[in-house]
């Protein structure tokens, strides 16, 4: 479990850095656990360089039995939909002309239940597109309509990866709605945009990351199954969003150091956090190629002979759509009466860009990773 967590974190960080290069000042959001689960399913049917590249990019070198490693995380996170509005949908759609081998079907059945679907891209393209769109819409309770953009599939599509993930959090401690005020959010040194700023005074786990002049806070969601970790620069110091130093120094090792519970302690905090919603449709293909997935998308070099005897099979497209919404909503915040008096309070005022992680606490896996740069 630990090896898989480290692998997932390393992949998350590397893909995040790729996405930041593409959009230095934009909001970023993706679900690393969705992508790595889907790619690990594709790896079961891959051989040779294709299988090796997936293993390297996803950092599976030290992970024993990858497919069953994902199963407890996936089933655990799926159970959380009774506490939160949370869905992680991962699908591999395969054209029926591939005649999947019985070995591939049986080896993926248990660890990837419901994640593999055979469809007809070749002869019933429009019908298949409609089926995928309506299926994802239903699975995400209507959050995502028409997940497949124009020209995302063709009658030549053999393998399609579709991820759809959304989360509307409910906090352990509710933010009082009467305290939410419009405030300026500094998107850089000179410009601001108005934002609805939520305010709460309570005890949270707080830490300082001196190397990058940042603070980090852990905000638990209801029942503490998930937490949001926010890394906030003490000020906007660069000419961009103020996150350049974090993005430069971020790697799998530094992320582990920054989020290590031993570097944080409980403190009384005066917290200000914007209400926000980030919805992203990312096309991770180019980023995954940059990380080393060279043959996966290339018909002339990909090898999916572990899945089918058909030659020239590659992954045609990866659709990754995610949405995260943060509001005041949460449980009743019970603070001890009188405990506020005469106590020093730390301030955590997220009125400028920050990096955030939504973590599954039991397995410490990253469910969502992103940055909020602008309302």
From Swiss-Prot:
Compartment(s) where it occurs, according to its Swiss-Prot or TrEMBL record: Secreted, Extracellular space
UniProtKB keywords: Glycoprotein, Secreted
Site (Reactive bond homolog) location in chain: 340-341
Alphabetized GO MF terms: serine-type endopeptidase inhibitor activity
A cellular component term, taken from the record's GO annotations: extracellular space
GO biological process: extracellular matrix organization; morphogenesis of an epithelium; prostate gland morphogenesis; regulation of epithelial cell proliferation
Glycosylation sites: 99, 133, 188, 298, 361
Highest taxon in the source lineage: Eukaryota
Principal cellular location given in the protein's record: secreted
CDD domains assigned: serpinB5_maspin (cd02057)
Gene3D superfamilies per UniProt: Alpha-1-antitrypsin, domain 1, Antithrombin, subunit I, domain 2
Protein family membership: Belongs to the serpin family. Ov-serpin subfamily.
Subunit field text: Interacts with IRF6.
Protein function: Tumor suppressor. It blocks the growth, invasion, and metastatic properties of mammary tumors. As it does not undergo the S (stressed) to R (relaxed) conformational transition characteristic of active serpins, it exhibits no serine protease inhibitory activity.
Name of the protein in its database record: Serpin B5
Naturally occurring in which organism (per UniProt): Rattus norvegicus (Rat)
């Amino acid at each position: 479990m630990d090896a898989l967590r480290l692998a997932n974190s390393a992949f998350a960080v590397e893909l995040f850095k790729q996405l930041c290069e593409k959009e230095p000042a934009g909001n970023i959001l993706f679900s690393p656990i969705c992508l790595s689960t889907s790619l690990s399913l594709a790896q079961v049917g891959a051989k040779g360089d294709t299988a090796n590249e997936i293993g390297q990019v996803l950092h599976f070198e030290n992970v024993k039995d990858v497919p069953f490693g994902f199963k407890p995380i996936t089933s655990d996170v799926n159970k959380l939909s009774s506490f939160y509005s949370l869905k992680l949908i991962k699908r591999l759609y395969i054209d029926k002309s591939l005649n999947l081998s019985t070995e591939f079907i049986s080896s993926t059945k248990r660890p990837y239940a419901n994640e593999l679907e055979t469809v007809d891209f070749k002869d019933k393209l429009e019908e298949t597109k409609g089926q995928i769109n309506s299926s994802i819409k239903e699975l995400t309770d209507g959050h995502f309509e028409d997940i497949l953009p124009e020209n995302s599939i063709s009658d030549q599509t053999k393998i399609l990866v579709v991820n759809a993930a959304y989360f509307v959090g409910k906090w352990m401690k509710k933010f009082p709605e009467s305290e939410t005020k419009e405030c300026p959010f500094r998107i850089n040194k000179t410009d601001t945009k108005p934002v609805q700023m939520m305010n709460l005074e309570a005890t949270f786990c707080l830490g300082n990351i001196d190397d990058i002049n940042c603070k980090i806070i852990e905000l638990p969601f209801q029942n503490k199954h998930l937490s949001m970790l926010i890394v906030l620069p003490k000020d906007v110091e660069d000419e961009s969003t103020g996150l350049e130093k974090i993005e430069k120094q971020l790697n799998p090792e530094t992320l582990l150091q920054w989020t290590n519970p031993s570097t944080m302690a409980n403190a009384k905090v005066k917290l200000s956090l914007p209400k926000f919603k980030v919805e992203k449709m990312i096309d991770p293909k180019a980023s995954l190629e940059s990380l080393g997935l060279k043959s996966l998308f290339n018909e002339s070099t990909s090898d999916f002979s572990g899945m089918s005897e058909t030659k020239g099979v590659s992954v045609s497209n990866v659709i990754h759509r995610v949405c995260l919404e943060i509001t005041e909503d949460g449980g009743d915040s019970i603070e001890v009466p009188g405990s506020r008096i005469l106590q020093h309070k730390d301030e955590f005022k997220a009125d400028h860009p920050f990096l955030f992680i939504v973590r599954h606490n039991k397995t410490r896996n990253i469910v969502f990773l992103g940055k909020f740069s602008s309302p």
